[in-house]
Regions:
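Conserved beta-strand hairpin/beta-sheet module of binuclear metal-dependent hydrolase folds
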Residues: 33-84, 188-200
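Acidic/histidine-rich helix-loop elements
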Residues: 39-55, 131, 138, 207-214
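Divalent metal-coordination and catalytic microenvironments
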Residues: 35, 60, 70, 85, ...
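Metallo-beta-lactamase
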Residues: 65-67, 73-75, 166, 173, ...
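Accessory terminal helices/loops
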Residues: 229-231, 242-309
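Active-site HxH/HxHxD metal-binding segment of metal-dependent hydrolases
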Residues: 83-166, 261
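N-terminal signal peptide c-region/cleavage motif recognized by signal peptidases
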Residues: 16-18
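Bacterial N-terminal signal peptides that target proteins for export
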Residues: 1-8
Length: 309
């Protein structure tokens, strides 16, 4: 009997340790320019290994303060990011810029509020965060496990900022612009003027297929063209690797235009998503990571959207 008790104890201990270890974010920032760093997210879907850390988080160190771009998927993630930033600089984290409300970018907000950071987010996306945040939090907990979301909560905060907005971190100026009704209802784009690095959030994806749950494809397409024509050395997308050349922006453009055209044609012809899926994923889209999952999930959303217009 004691043997079985010991076995049960060891199993419980192992499972507890496993749950704890799975909740540690093994992340390391990459310095993409002097005092500009990026935690590049996993390019897979959120799962119980990556803990939802699938988007890119950045931070910029000035002479007086630090600015962080995107809070990440959870309180634990944000805590780890802050811990790492403090190992690079003792300066205060004064600003958190949240590019939009999607969980992988915003669910770490409460931790930054705890340390006194000023949260900057478009009003349209604050509204979405408040409206859908708790529902989305329940969904991601169910999807990958509660252990990743310890202390994660949707918190109230105000926003009195108007865009474009200019911030001075001390010898380092940052501009923030609002791109309304693009990938989301209010995407923020952040440029570090010293390094000519632009953080564009989910207006641009590399390596993987772009997602379109709240997108206005027409505007989004225009915004990518606008970003492409700006003067920059590097672009940090919301997902995927560093962008060094303009051609990398075309991957997002091609996908969103293709899925948009397919959805509109389906509505015009009365074609159902199932009929399109029976033909398989188009060959030109197969090079995108997560292409099949994204195509199957997002095409019906667009078709339903255009049918209701």
């Amino acid at each position: 009997m004691q043997y079985f008790k010991n076995i049960v104890f060891l199993l419980v201990l192992f499972n507890s340790f496993q749950a704890f270890s799975e909740s540690i974010y093994n992340i390391t920032p990459i310095e993409v320019s002097k005092n500009v760093y990026v935690f590049f997210g996993d390019v897979n879907n959120l799962n119980n290994v990556n803990g939802g850390a699938i988007s890119n988080t950045g931070f910029i160190i000035g002479k007086k303060s630090i600015l962080v771009i995107d809070a990440g998927p959870s309180y634990l993630y944000a805590s780890r990011v802050i811990e790492i930033i403090k190992s690079y600089s003792s300066l205060p984290i004064k600003h958190l810029i949240v590019t939009h409300h999607h969980p992988d970018h915003s669910f770490g907000i409460s931790k930054f509020i705890e340390i006194g950071a000023n949260v900057i987010m478009s009003q349209a996306e604050i509204n979405m965060y408040f409206k859908y945040g708790n529902r989305l939090l329940r969904q991601v907990k169910k999807s990958i496990g509660d252990n990743w979301f310890i202390k994660t909560k949707i918190v109230k905060f105000g926003n009195n900022e108007e865009f474009p907005l200019n911030l001075d971190l001390g010898g380092r100026k940052v501009s923030i612009e609002l791109y309304s009704q693009g990938h989301s209802e209010g995407d923020l784009v952040i440029e570090d003027l010293l390094s000519k690095i632009i953080f564009v959030g989910d207006l641009v994806f590399t390596e993987r297929a772009p997602t379109i749950p709240h997108a206005n494809i027409t505007n989004w397409n225009k915004y990518i063209s606008d970003i492409k024509n700006r003067k920059w050395d590097y672009i940090i997308p919301g997902h995927g690797e560093l962008i060094k050349i303009q051609e990398q922006l075309l991957l997002t453009k091609y996908w969103i235009n293709y899925i948009d055209k397919t959805a509109k044609q389906a509505v015009l012809n009365g074609t159902s998503p199932a009929e399109i899926f029976n033909e398989g994923i188009p060959a030109s889209l197969r090079k995108y990571k997560l292409a099949k999952e994204t195509w199957i999930r997002d095409l019906p959303l667009l078709i339903n959207k255009y049918e209701s217009e």
